[in-house]
Every structure is written in structure tokens, then in C-alpha cells.
A protein has these predicted regions:
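Short beta-strand segments
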Residues: 57-59, 141-143, 222
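Catalytic-core segments of class I nucleotidyltransferases/pyrophosphorylases
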Residues: 112, 120, 126-133, 146-147, ...
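Short beta-strand-to-turn element immediately C-terminal to the catalytic PLP-Schiff-base lysine
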Residues: 143-144, 153-156, 179-180, 286-287
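Structural signal for interior beta-strand "rungs" in well-ordered beta-sheet cores
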Residues: 250-300
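Conserved N-terminal catalytic core of the sugar/cofactor nucleotidyltransferase
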Residues: 1-15, 20-26, 34-116, 120-121, ...
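Short beta-strand-to-loop element that shapes/binds the nucleotide-sugar donor at the catalytic cleft/hinge
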Residues: 139-153, 169
Length: 300
């Protein structure tokens, strides 16, 4: 680890239900879906970045059975990750629930929030962190070239001055990746508790990031033009990013029963599926639970 990053921790939230990827995440967690090959998982991009930081924490889905594959995968990555399990779907309220453990002991440090379903390449974590420290605000937002979804950020010099879903006025997108002062997170958690928070769901964007933008406390950092970022939490984007990484080849997960004459083209077949000679699979995401086969055709 670079000495600069000894004061930077990381959090990987993995506790959501991933409803945008239904039905394929009904029985397997989004973080554990293959990404580009059967040896890579969606969450690996976040873990790769987190391994450059001092301490890594992960919030887990409340269902212990659902998270067993993820915990097993972490063990194979030789990653020292401390986990915290949500008691129900909480969103960013996990950071309130576990604020003492996540931030109290490292109050003078900072934390990078790394969503488990984001693919990111070419991020200079050290430069991102140094920019955050030099600008001195509570939050620094990682910006990327404009996407056709999500939040767009208005910028003046190195400060975010507006954030909106309206693309017409802005030329940069928020990646949903942030570096945050631990002290600011503790203050937010304390305020929520004082106002009567009792476990209700919270949004990192709406309840923490956006208020900081309008208080003038959000800096920005632009991903290098040679970098790459995408949120793979929808069926279409999950499919397209797999095809990008596989060079257009099929992504056949582990534990797939594949007959010798199966006809599969530019598709993703998730673990547990038995593909016989009768199937013709073309530009699809396919999963199976018990005897129910789920097929999603992606229109390009």
C-alpha cells in the first residue's frame, strides 16, 4: 500500500435486493454474478480498488444464506474485509447503524464508498485521494463522461454546485463513488439519531451527498479520459459489460451443465442452469432455480 493511502479506508455496500436485475438475482446475489468470465465476479472491481486502501469494510444483506457465496468468494480473494450485516434493507442507513465501528476509531481519516455493482478501470486512487485532501471539503465526487442515466453534476472550478437528473444543463455524470471525511459521516449519523432515526432506510445520494453539494462542501474529481466506468445494476448494462469484457464471447458460469451440441451465442448463462440440445440461446441472460428457467433477451 502507498503511504498516502494509509489514511483512506473503503466501504463496499452489498446489502441491496438488486431488483433491477430480477429475476436473475432472486436466488443469487448481484455482487456474485459473473463479469466477463466465470472466474470474475461483479464485486471484484470494487475489491480491486479497496485492496489499495488501509481498511476495507463491507455491508451484507440481512439473509445469511443469500450471502454465503459472497463470503466464500472474499476468502478466495485473500482480502481482509470486515463485514457488517444489515438487519433489514437499509440503504445508506447502514452507515448510521454501524457508524461507531466504521468511523469513530478513525475519525481523522477518510473513506471511499465503492458500490459493488460498478465496473471501474483506470482510477488513480492516490491522485483521487490527494485531490480530496487538498480541496478540503467533506465530500469528493468521482465524475465521469455523461451517461444516459443517473445524476448529472454542475461544476464551478473544482466544486460541485448542482446535481440533477436533467442532462440538458450539465456535461458530467456522478459515478456514485465518493471519498468522504469520516468526521462528516459521524456528524451526519449523530444528527440522524438525534432526530429520531430508528432503522429507516436512507439514501446516500439524497440524504448526504446532495445536501453537501448545496452547502458548497462537495469537491469533484474527474476520471482520466483513458479510464472506464459503468453501473452494471440493470439487465442491459450487465449484459453489455459482460460482452465488452469477454470480447463478445459467451460467459458460461461455473456449475452450468452444458450439452455438447448446445447452441449458445453472445449470451450469459448463470450457475445452476442445465442447457440441453433443445435450447437456442442468442443474446440472452439465462438463469435457473429448481425447475424454473429464466431467460431475458437483450435487444441491441
Amino acid at each position: 500500500m502507498r503511504e498516502t493511502l494509509t489514511n483512506l479506508n473503503s466501504i463496499i455496500p452489498t446489502a441491496g435486493n438488486a431488483t433491477r436485475l430480477y429475476p436473475h438475482t432472486l436466488f443469487q446475489q448481484k455482487a456474485m454474478l459473473p463479469m466477463g468470465s466465470p472466474d470474475k465476479r461483479v464485486v471484484d472491481s470494487a475489491i480491486d480498488i479497496a485492496q489499495q486502501t488501509n481498511e476495507t469494510y463491507m455491508t451484507l444483506h440481512w439473509d445469511e444464506e443469500y450471502t454465503k457465496p459472497l463470503l466464500g468468494h472474499i476468502a478466495t480473494r485473500n482480502s481482509e474485509i470486515t463485514t457488517f450485516r444489515d438487519r433489514h434493507i437499509m440503504g445508506a442507513a447502514s452507515l448510521i447503524e454501524f457508524s461507531d465501528e466504521l468511523f469513530e476509531n478513525d475519525i481523522e481519516k477518510d473513506t471511499i464508498i465503492l458500490p459493488a455493482d460498478h465496473i471501474i478501470e483506470g482510477l488513480d486512487v492516490e491522485d483521487f485521494y490527494l485531490t480530496h485532501k487538498n480541496l478540503g471539503n467533506d465530500v469528493t465526487i468521482l465524475l465521469v463522461p455523461p451517461k444516459d442515466y443517473g445524476q448529472y453534476v454542475g461544476v464551478s472550478e473544482n466544486t460541485a454546485v448542482d446535481i440533477s437528473t436533467d442532462r440538458s444543463s450539465f456535461t458530467l455524470s456522478s459515478s456514485g463513488i465518493y471519498i468522504i471525511r469520516n468526521k462528516a459521516m459521524l456528524e451526519w449519523a449523530a444528527m440522524e439519531k438525534k432526530q429520531g432515526w430508528a432503522g429507516e432506510i436512507r439514501s446516500m445520494l439524497q440524504d448526504f451527498i446532495t445536501p453537501n453539494v448545496y452547502k458548497g462542501q462537495a469537491s469533484v474529481y474527474k476520471l482520466h479520459e483513458s479510464g472506464y466506468w459503468d453501473d452494471v445494476g440493470t439487465l442491459r448494462r450487465y449484459y453489455l459489460n459482460n460482452m465488452r469484457l469477454s470480447g463478445g464471447e459467451n460467459v458460461i458460469d461455473n456449475n452450468v451443465e452444458l450439452s455438447a451440441n448446445a447452441k449458445i451465442r453472445r449470451s450469459i448463462v448463470l450457475g445452476g442452469v442445465a442447457v440441453t440440445d433443445l435450447y437456442r440461446i442468442d443474446k440472452e441472460i439465462v438463469s435457473q432455480n429448481d425447475n424454473i428457467l429464466y431467460r431475458t433477451r437483450i435487444e441491441l
